[in-house]
Amino acid sequence: MTGGKVAAALAAAGIPHRIGTRRPSAAGEVAFDWAAPALASNALEGAQAVYIVAPTDRSDHGRVMVPILQAALANGVKRFVLLSSSMLEPGDPMMGEVHAWIAAHAAEWAVLRPSWFMQNLMTQHRRSIMQDRVIFTATGQGRCGFIDAGDISATAVAALTSNTAWNRDHILTGPEALSYDEVAAALTASLGIPVRHVALTEEDCAARWRAQGMDDAYARTLAAMDSRIAAGAEDRVTYCVARLTRRAPVALRDFIDGNRTLWTDKPMKG
């Protein structure tokens, strides 16, 4: 979701780069899989900086990712920029484990900790919005500083190309903190169809994620994050995007208006 945008920005700036992907199909792409460490050498050869995105089909990020990052460090990679989450402190599960390792071992590093992606409305919530006109979460009335993936990517490019290493983490948000009730109202106003938010229990939320193919640990972690949002953990706005990229972050209503057809085309089947 952010990697392609980072690559496009680097290409536009004339900065040499390569994209590590499970299914390389274009120039500049090389085979890479966190579960296949032998592939890493080709992806990392000659690299001075890396943008790190964790696998989304598993939750044991420290065990899987750190050995490859150790190899990257040993092979001359100087700067590490990790995409993590506003919910994960260094040493926490998943990307938090990788955050702690990078901060302890890399000479040049940055960890981006965005709040919830606006693009989640186009992916994990799209089917329920189109078919049932509903968003399901366990966030209650809690608010998030929803952020556009393009703003995260712009911050990642700044971290990769800055003359000086940041050597810290940054909490990234959009310009306003909103509840999912307010998100549903924004969708209703833009799309011209009624969309509502249905509040689930944490366990029911985890069950929905498992039904969509997530492993149990990942599903439970995401559902627990929703409960923390309900308790107010994400009710904040930071100004890191504007300060680090010198551009204002995208507002949710503008994001919805700019992508309206994604929710108004023929409903998804299956």
Predicted regions: what is each one?
Residues 30:
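Conserved Rossmann-like nucleotide-binding pocket used by diverse enzymes
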Residues 1-23, 27, 35-37, 45-47, ...:
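Oxidoreductase cofactor-interface core, primarily capturing Rossmann-like NAD(P)-dependent enzymes
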Residues 203-270:
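A hydrophobic C-terminal alpha-helical subdomain
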